């Protein structure tokens, strides 16, 4: 498990399978064979936490439907696991349409250690509509009070609109054999519901060529499964999906007056909608290529999230890290011996930001048995203080009993900012 991971991780990212939490999937949630892969991943993280090597930041990505999947039980299970391991947690729902002509809403759950100072500009006091939609707010309100107490609303700046439309990513010069026949296109139109036919008629009468998308959606009926051709004509592509899901391959719809033509989206067009560079080497087969797109996260979304939130948080977690990598290597041996050890003068840091104080601060590392570490962290969470402050208060009481003054804090280690 975690023994094969060296040192302390600044950031851990997991995009666990969405098949069982997606609208297009089986909806069995984190109990499902695919999406349940979260739990083996989490077992590794828990081992790192117990070894004193908790990752500074944890980022989890999945489809937006995770918020309500499995009767609404999956989201609190994930958030509760993070909080139980000593993290504060927040989440954002980001649509790739903010960056690309591609509607792709994904939830990003971001957690950071309880003791880490968070820059004020990375937080907002109240949820914002752009990234904290109503279903997320309701799910947070329904969390147990002890878990909700550790919730954060992350601040993410909105990007500048790119202005790119679906027509801008369409490949020209598609050979005649790449288009559907008139009969195939007529069959798709016949599977549109009245609302989609209205959209099609609007494109026909717009007076200019229009490009839209169709995706085939299957529904279970009493008398069998029915298929519908869902249309989008607003210059943004519908979400690219796995080609073997209940919602099938993406189809492009071209309308110019009474002329209506359809064809499958090309791999190059799909890559552009995911924000991949033209030089990106794609698989050789259609299904393998769109399998990548269906499983993937839009590139500019991750880049924006990393630059504006994840990297600043990782820097903060790294600066707070209480031990050196060399000291971490001793943790496993201490756990085997069953000892509690205090190693002084592991690191020293010059005092720069406290007027009137000169010299250096001395860092110490406390090694605890896993069960004791867990017990103390839970107590710290209940008291709404950092683990450091919890231990320091115990030291203050012993000093007071011996007629000595409490320990002077070089930096605030009480309730962490943003907690």
Language-model region placement:
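The alpha-helix within a helix-turn-helix
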Residues: 380
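A detector of short terminal or domain-flanking linear segments
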Residues: 319-360, 371, 419
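C-terminal target-recognition/interaction regions appended to catalytic cores
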Residues: 173-323
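Short, conserved micro-motifs enriched in small and acidic residues
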Residues: 31, 35, 292-300, 385, ...
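Short amphipathic alpha-helical segments
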Residues: 364-368, 376, 384-396
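Class I S-adenosyl-L-methionine
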Residues: 2-11, 19, 23-232
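Short acidic/His/Gly/Ser-rich catalytic and metal-binding motifs that mark active-site loops
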Residues: 18-24, 249, 282
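Short, positively charged interaction helices/loops
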Residues: 400-419
């Amino acid at each position: 498990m975690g023994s094969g991971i060296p040192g302390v991780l600044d950031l851990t990212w997991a995009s666990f399978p969405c098949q069982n939490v997606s609208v297009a999937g089986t909806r069995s949630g984190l109990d499902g064979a695919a999406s349940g892969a979260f739990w083996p991943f989490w077992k590794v993280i828990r081992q790192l936490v117990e070894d004193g090597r908790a990752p500074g930041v944890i980022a989890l990505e999945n489809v937006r439907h995770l918020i309500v999947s499995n009767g609404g039980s999956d989201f609190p299970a994930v958030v509760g696991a993070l909080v139980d391991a000593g993290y504060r947690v927040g989440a954002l729902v980001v649509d790739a349409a903010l960056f690309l002509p591609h509607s792709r809403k994904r939830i990003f759950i971001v957690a950071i250690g309880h003791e880490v100072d968070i820059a004020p500009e990375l937080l907002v006091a109240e949820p914002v509509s752009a990234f904290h939609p109503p279903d997320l707010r309701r799910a947070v309100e329904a969390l147990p009070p002890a878990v909700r107490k550790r919730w954060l609303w992350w601040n993410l700046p909105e990007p500048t609109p790119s202005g790119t439309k679906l027509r801008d990513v369409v490949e020209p010069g598609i050979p005649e054999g790449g288009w559907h026949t008139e009969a195939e296109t007529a069959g798709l139109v016949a599977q549109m519901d009245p609302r989609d036919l209205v959209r099609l008629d609007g494109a026909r009468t717009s007076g200019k060529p229009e490009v839209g998308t169709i995706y085939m959606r299957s529904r279970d009926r009493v008398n069998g499964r029915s298929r519908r051709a869902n249309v989008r004509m607003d210059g943004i592509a519908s979400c690219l999906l796995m080609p073997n899901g209940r919602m099938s391959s993406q189809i492009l719809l071209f309308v110019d007056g009474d002329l209506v033509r359809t064809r499958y989206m090309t791999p190059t067009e799909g890559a552009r909608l995911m924000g991949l560079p033209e030089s990106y080497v794609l698989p050789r087969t259609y299904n393998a290529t769109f399998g990548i797109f269906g499983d993937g996260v839009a590139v500019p979304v991750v880049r924006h999230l990393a630059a504006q939130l994840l990297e600043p948080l990782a820097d903060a977690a790294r600066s707070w890290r209480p031990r050196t990598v060399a000291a971490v290597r001793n943790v496993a041996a201490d756990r085997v011996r069953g000892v509690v050890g205090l190693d002084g003068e592991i690191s020293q840091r010059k005092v720069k930001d406290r007027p009137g104080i000169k010299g250096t601060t001395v860092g110490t590392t406390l090694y605890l048995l896993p069960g004791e570490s867990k017990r103390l962290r839970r107590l710290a969470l209940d008291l709404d203080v950092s683990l450091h402050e919890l231990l320091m208060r115990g030291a203050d009481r012993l000093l007071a009993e011996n007629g000595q003054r409490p320990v002077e804090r070089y930096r605030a280690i009480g309730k962490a900012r943003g907690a």
